[in-house]
A protein has these predicted regions:
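N-terminal signal peptide c-region/cleavage motif recognized by signal peptidases
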Residues: 23-24
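Periplasmic polypeptide-binding modules associated with outer-membrane biogenesis and secretion
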Residues: 29-42, 55-295, 300, 314-330, ...
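Residues that define the transmembrane beta-barrel architecture of outer-membrane proteins
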Residues: 74, 293-295, 328-332, 363-367, ...
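C-terminal outer-membrane beta-barrel translocator/porin domains of Gram-negative envelope proteins
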Residues: 248, 267, 281-282, 288-290, ...
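Repeated loop/turn-to-beta-strand initiation elements of outer-membrane beta-barrel proteins
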Residues: 253, 281-283, 294, 306-313, ...
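Transmembrane beta-barrel strands of outer-membrane/channel proteins
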Residues: 261, 285-289, 299, 315-319, ...
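Outer-membrane beta-barrel architecture
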Residues: 272-274, 300-302, 335-337, 368-372, ...
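Outer-membrane beta-barrel "beta-signal"
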Residues: 301, 410, 564-575, 590-602
């Protein structure tokens, strides 16, 4: 049944609303029944979940007038659902105590209703006869479901209209819209003829970006970061890219790029850019516990827009080995990102680091200072390069108070295609680093390589079972191991490499000590299975090998570990992680190890 609005029906609706509000006619539990012969199980479920009458109790509809109001609204609701499913000739009957709801006068409605019966005669399923969208922009692809002979649905019509409009917008016609739409149901043939006429409008070019909103960022910096394409042909993708560049700075809580309603007489289209700044400062904390290495604490302090040019100043600090087997060590780092110094997808940065590392095999103090540039290719891919100096003073297996002075040129590229950074179920992550280092003050020169690749795949629906794998490769090419600072060399063991083995326990024997290798290979595999939405169990195996040469070979030293773990999901923070691991291979093992932290192991 399809109802048309009229002044009389509107007046009846007003009176009806007043009566619903004023008359406390409470009804006893309403007995309901839905009959839809020939309808699929999924369609019946949709009707049951959507009908106001069938869900009256859960909606809190108590009075007879509320039940009647729900029944009247259900006519339109059910017909629309039938149209969505391709039934364009349905007959809907809703009876309250045996009387058709549409025929009940609200002013003389009974005080209670005891029973509601909904009967839906679906009729035949319709198919498209005509399915036309005109005119179309070049290369526009309409939905496959909108074609002659295909099952007719209102959803297919709406999607076809949207695709046609979007095709013109992609071609630069920013104000393209639907001009007219003709839909004819031919009941005798169970056929639906749909014709959609589009109004492309003129092709427009980008005009000006007009900055609005409450922001303390200099407008000149906003424009440089945005790279607004004034003078270029309109493109929705370019608008989206402008917003992405601005959000990427981490300065703004809200970025809205909205086109003006009316184009300019010269064929350009201006845009309003509205901003709201995030709070200027942000503090984070982290902790990780390992049985042998004690507690590691980390903290960061970030100041956004520190010089009103959308810069981000970040301090980080760490304390390690608290209560562990080695002396407490830590680090203090600083990085200043400057997004408005180069082009819209490029930024510059300053970095500085002071670090002390105390391990079983070496102690080293490091200071570094660098300046670099970063190119962002997409939300998933970036590369950066910098130049700077590093000073290292080390005590290791090769001697005490050894000094290393370098001019370094680190390159790094990261490609992140994971579906989640904190608990991935599919995709991959690649991190490649190359760092040439030129020795100063009689220090040897060389190149350091490092690669970290991770992959994820789901076996069950909704990520119920996830297989995760990781490969790490490292190499130092050029100088011998005894002529390189120990923090450039490679060890294996502990969280991040081989769980079940003590931290950095595997290296190259040198006299009575152990030094790092010039090459490293790490392999890790995990099977993650959900027990509940929040709780997961994990089984894992890790393998590590180091070698004195620049490539891990048959003569390398190796070890491995395996174990089980529990993950408890903390939402956007990632899971709370607890792992138990034991040595499997090698002579560096020290019994059962446990690890507690936030986030997946990789």
């Amino acid at each position: 049944m399809i109802a048309r609005s009229s002044p009389r029906s509107l007046m009846q609706g007003w009176i009806f609303g007043a009566l619903v509000a004023l008359v406390p006619n409470l009804t006893s539990a309403l007995e309901t029944k839905l009959s839809a012969p020939g309808a699929s199980e999924s369609l019946v479920e949709r009707l049951e979940e959507t009908s106001s009458v069938l869900t009256a109790e859960t909606r809190g509809l108590d009075t007879s007038l509320e039940i009647l109001s729900a029944a009247l609204s259900d006519y339109r609701t059910i017909v629309q659902i039938m149209y969505d499913e391709g039934y364009f000739g349905p007959v809907v009957s809703i009876k309250l105590d045996g009387q058709e709801a549409a025929e009940i006068d609200a002013l003389s409605a009974p005080s209670t209703f005891k029973r509601a019966d909904i009967t839906v005669d679906t009729g035949p399923r319709y198919r498209f006869g005509k399915a036309i969208v005109q005119p179309l922009a070049p290369d526009t692809v309409l939905p496959e479901d909108f074609a002659p002979g295909k099952r007719a649905t209102t959803g297919a019509i709406q999607q076809a209209a949207s695709a046609g409009v979007q095709g013109w917008r992609d071609a630069g016609h920013a104000k393209a819209d639907v001009a007219d739409q003709e839909v004819i149901a031919r009941h005798a043939q169970a056929r639906l003829d749909a014709t959609i006429d589009l109004a492309p409008g003129p092709q427009l070019t980008f005009g000006k970006m007009i900055i609005q909103g409450d922001t303390t960022v200099q407008h000149s910096s906003i424009r440089k970061i945005a790279g607004f394409p004034s003078g270029e042909v309109y493109s929705p993708q370019k608008v989206q890219k402008v917003g992405t560049r601005l959000r990427r700075t981490g300065t703004f809580g809200v970025v809205s790029i909205t086109e003006r309603e009316t184009p300019n007489p010269d064929g350009t289209l201006d845009f309003d850019a509205t901003f709201e700044d995030l709070p200027p400062r942000r503090i984070t904390f982290g902790a990780e516990i390992a049985s042998r290495d004690g507690v590691d604490l980390t903290a960061t302090w970030t100041h956004r827009n520190v010089f009103r040019r959308a810069e981000r100043l970040r301090f980080e600090a760490a304390l390690r080995n608290i209560g562990g087997a080695e002396d407490i060590d830590g680090r203090i780092g600083l990085r200043l990102d400057q997004p408005d110094r180069l082009g819209p997808d490029d930024s510059t940065f300053w970095s500085a680091l002071l670090e002390r590392r105390n391990t079983e095999n070496y102690n080293v103090s490091v200071a570094s200072l660098g300046y670099g540039a970063r190119r962002t290719f997409s939300d998933q891919l970036y590369a950066e390069a910098s130049a700077g100096f590093q000073w290292s003073d080390a005590d290791d297996a090769y001697g005490d108070r050894r000094k290393f002075r370098y001019f370094i040129i680190p390159f790094r590229s990261e490609w992140d295609q994971r579906d989640s950074k904190v608990s991935a179920t599919s995709g991959y992550y690649l991190d490649a680093q190359i760092m040439p280092f030129a020795g100063l003050s009689d220090t040897d020169s060389g190149i350091r390589f490092f690669f970290d690749g991770r992959g994820y795949t789901s076996l069950g629906s909704g990520g119920s079972i996830v297989l995760a794998g990781r490969v790490q490769l490292g190499s130092v090419y050029g100088p011998p191991a005894d002529s390189v600072t120990p923090d450039f060399l490679f060890f294996s063991g502990g969280a991040g490499t081989v769980r079940g083995q003590p931290f950095e326990s595997l290296g190259i024997p040198v006299g009575t000590g152990v030094a790092g290798g010039r090459s490293f290979l790490g392999l890790s595999g995990e099977v993650r299975g959900k027990v509940t939405n929040s709780l997961s169990l994990v089984g894992f195996y890790d393998y590590g090998a180091v070698d004195l040469t620049s490539v891990v070979g048959s003569g390398s030293r190796e070890h491995s570990g395996a174990g089980i773990g529990v993950r408890y999901d903390l939402g956007g923070f990632g899971p709370l992680r607890f792992d138990l691991a034991v040595p499997v291979q090698g002579d560096t093992g020290d019994g059962l190890q446990f690890y507690l932290g936030i986030g997946q192991a990789f």
